Amino acid sequence: MGACLLDAFETILTCDFTTYRRELPVLAGIPADVMFEEFGRIAPALTDGRLSLAAGYDHILRTCGAGPRPELVRALMDRGIELLSASGRLFEDVRPFMAGLRARGIKIAIVSNCDEQVRGLLGSLGVTPLADALVLSCEVGAAKPSPRIFERALEVLGVSAEAALFVDDNPGFCAGATALGIRAAHLVRGEPGAQAPAGGATVVRSLADVEAMLSA
């Protein structure tokens, strides 16, 4: 196996968004339910890069009657990444797993559906130096399960689909990978009753199980 493609959220890291969801609306001067309802509407465009984060905040401020205010957009972006970074943590098995792959010469790409804040989050958590590439939907212009984001990851790493293993907590995204001929592991942390998803992915309970697949 030449490469491992890893999802970010709930695969290698998790975030507690409580403070994020409490503080940003106060800073924006918008009720939390109104702000995050509008965030939900524009989330697909933020995720696939059609809308930048700055443009997204500007849209929300204008739509909710609090804009345009360029200085507030900047403040929201800065505070947002601060709160996101403070709330994020890696699962305990991530660093040893990634270090072990690098020691074996297995290339690593983080393949995430996300907005542009997540590059900073991965850097703050120390993931960036452990990976060969960050393949983010907002930069690629396509989100999982689209084949384009998987193809981009393979291209960046210089490996074939048959030489890669994809790990994600979302079975639909795993199916997107297997449709391209990439082996997939559906990571189900703490859910012993989960069944194998459609599409040929293998259910695993931890990254130790993934390591065993890479050795097979």
Mark where each language-model region is.
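Asp-based, Mg2+/Mn2+-dependent phosphohydrolase catalytic module
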Residues: M1-L6, R95, A99-G100, A109-A216
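N-terminal helical cap/lid subdomain that shapes the substrate entry/recognition surface
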Residues: M1-R95, A103-R104
